[in-house]
UniProtKB/Swiss-Prot annotation:
One of the primary rRNA binding proteins, it binds directly to 16S rRNA where it helps nucleate assembly of the platform of the 30S subunit by binding and bridging several RNA helices of the 16S rRNA. Forms an intersubunit bridge (bridge B4) with the 23S rRNA of the 50S subunit in the ribosome. The keyword Hydrolase does not apply. GO terms for biological process: translation. Gene3D superfamilies: 6.10.250.3130, S15/NS1, RNA-binding. SMART domains: Ribosomal_S15 (SM01387). This is Small ribosomal subunit protein uS15. One of its GO terms (cellular component) is cytosolic small ribosomal subunit. The lineage of its organism: Bacteria, Pseudomonadati, Pseudomonadota, Gammaproteobacteria, Pseudomonadales. Part of the 30S ribosomal subunit. Forms a bridge to the 50S subunit in the 70S ribosome, contacting the 23S rRNA. Keywords: Ribonucleoprotein, Ribosomal protein, RNA-binding, rRNA-binding. The gene is rpsO. The keyword Protease does not apply.
Length: 89
């Protein structure tokens, strides 16, 4: 269910702000979004897995906090990120 090393590296390379950047809000939100999407697929087959659902809710909350932080710091970066990730339809 977790992202592979290759998937993480690809996401980091796609969303990084500078070389070696793994902690920027953009990278963190992109990684959380990928994990959330994988867990949503998991729940289609395993609807009664409530322990993993708790982890999913925690990830969604963490992503929300990071997006709120980014929106307060730089709205253009926020708008670009949600557009690239396909959030906020």
């Amino acid at each position: 269910m977790a992202l592979t090393v290759e998937e993480k590296a690809q996401i980091v390379n796609e969303y990084k702000q500078a070389e070696g950047d793994t902690g920027s809000p953009e990278v963190q939100v992109a990684l959380l979004t990928a994990n959330i999407n994988k867990l949503q697929d998991h729940f289609k087959a395993n609807g009664k897995d409530h322990h993993s659902r708790r982890g999913l809710i925690r990830m969604v909350n963490q992503r929300r906090k990071l997006l709120d932080y980014l929106k307060g710091k730089d709205t253009t970066r926020y708008s670009t990120l949600i557009g690239r990730l396909g959030l906020r339809r």
